[in-house]
């Protein structure tokens, strides 16, 4: 038979995804695809997880948070409430690299250009002064960065930024990039298998395409 394509998204349950994987391995004409490309290194869970240690006490012990391409007001409302509560207590600076949005609390917004990120890494940005002697700084991004074509380069730049922040900040433990997952099954979907992205060739060769 001709190719049958199943396009699965992140809201697909793990039970259904595992069943479809069994079909794909058993029948060669059965193809699994995802709607969007995602360049994600799943070798280490810390590459795509929100740190389990990012609880209220850690946020209270910090005086700086860097949000990178994430809008926690809509993408993580519980986290946004924690950050807002901490900011209202005072002595808590929030730097937001991304589009100008209303987070419901004060933050210093700078553009999301990679050139700005590069200047932070090189120490040529005025905001670098805030990293000096900062206390337990928190860095948060989202899984949206993995959809960029330059995601591998971008994540490497973020690791360099974290490394340099650790050199000048005061911290009880080594900092890491916290990744906010936008869908309930983001982690399971990312860790289950690396699916190819659906292409025009799939539409041409398939007798049926099913979106789940």
Enumerate the language-model features and the residues they cover:
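Catalytic alpha/large subunits of respiratory electron-transfer oxidoreductases
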Residues: 1-212
